[in-house]
Amino acid sequence: HGADLVAHSLTKYINGHGDAMGGAVIGAKALISQIKADALVDVGGAISPFNAWMITRGSVTLPLRLRQHTDNAQRVAEFLENDPFVAYVYYPGLASHPQHETAKRQFGDYGYGGMMAFAVEGDKETQNRFVSNLKVITSAVSLGHDESLIVHVGPQGRGGWERYPE
């Protein structure tokens, strides 16, 4: 089990500010050598020195930021789960999540991440109004920045959400 190669965005959590572009591919030396010989000819493989510096600068605070991300997400998930206007919260840190025990074994004391899914009760108009009225949270697609973001999928997008999709 496991992955032969892992591609990771350095732009998101590792940089932490969303102001640098970079990525990394991690894997066995033989596979990395193959990538260097083949793919890098087509797509390039050198990060700019300035982006490398900014990512290195951001990586220093990564453990502190991730702990805060997970702590905040846990508190927000618990708050939303108890809100009568929220239909469901999908977050593995909640005891109500169907895979909570598995997540607890796998993540231990490290927390359950900074992302969750939830649904606001009501029709499409009510849900759109909820997103439009947010003052501190930005409606945008990304993650790992120094701001909170929301992506409104809604029942028409991505095949629709159910309480706990299988």
Model-flagged regions — what are they?
Residues 85-166:
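Conserved C-terminal alpha-helix-loop-beta "cap" of PLP-dependent enzymes
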